[in-house]
Amino acid sequence: MQSILKPITNLFTMIFQAIHGFVASLDIFGVGAGYVITIFLLTLLVRLILLPLNIKQTRSQQKMQEIQPEIAKLQKKYKNNPEKAQQEMMKLYKENNVNPMSGCLPLLIQMPILFALYYVFTGLTELQGVSFLWLGDLWAPDRTFILPILSAATTYLSSLLMTKFTQSQAGGAPGGMNMNTMNIVMAGMMGVMSIQFPSMLVLYWVIGNLIQMVQTYFIVVLPSKKRAKEKEQYKDIK
């Protein structure tokens, strides 16, 4: 795994060191705070790079939720012919320009970045013993379990915010329970993994989730509220 991710690891090592060099040159932060600000800026950079992909994923998820009632009808209509049901669903996806796998793409891209950063941070031995707030060693896992809990909580809330508003736009489309279960499982996995990860890596994930929630608010929540308000105004006119 490490050899496969070596090019990405080397790239992020250079980016991290360049950002930290700039932050350190300002000479206004303590050592620990300087590293945390560096990880914030690195996370912000990664999220900005992934923003077009996240927008595309969000639109695809919204379309998927909108056609869920039609998918349910097809599944019911062809319940004794799964092959025909699959063909009709693929036709429906094509007609609505929906890729059912697009929702997995951002995660598939983020996971190699996450593991590459794991190798970046474990290789930065100068982080050993550097503290910040309750974290006694940014290079080591958080033994207070505060960061793992934050990792699980922000992962779940970030996913919940997205699914809540994409489903509400589709009028509470079916499959919400399955999505919620997936959100819980994903959050649980990240919480468990965060117990063993260096604190700096978990900080990257938590900060990334918080930035994702801000993005979701502006990309999904605000437009959703605006459309709901327009619908209410249209009903009042009628």
UniProtKB/Swiss-Prot annotation:
Keywords: Cell membrane, Chaperone, Membrane, Protein transport, Transmembrane, Transmembrane helix, Transport. One of its GO terms (cellular component) is plasma membrane. It comes from the Bacteria. One of its GO terms (biological process) is protein transport. Signal peptide: none annotated. GO terms for molecular function: membrane insertase activity. It is found in: Cell membrane. It is a multi-pass membrane protein. The chain crosses the membrane at residues 4-24, 26-46, 104-124, 145-165, 175-195, 201-221. NCBIfam families: yidC_oxa1_cterm. Required for the insertion and/or proper folding and/or complex formation of integral membrane proteins into the membrane. Involved in integration of membrane proteins that insert both dependently and independently of the Sec translocase complex, as well as at least some lipoproteins. Aids folding of multispanning membrane proteins. Belongs to the OXA1/ALB3/YidC family. Type 1 subfamily. Interacts with the Sec translocase complex via SecD. Specifically interacts with transmembrane segments of nascent integral membrane proteins during membrane integration. This is Membrane protein insertase YidC. It comes from Clostridium perfringens (strain 13 / Type A). The gene is yidC.
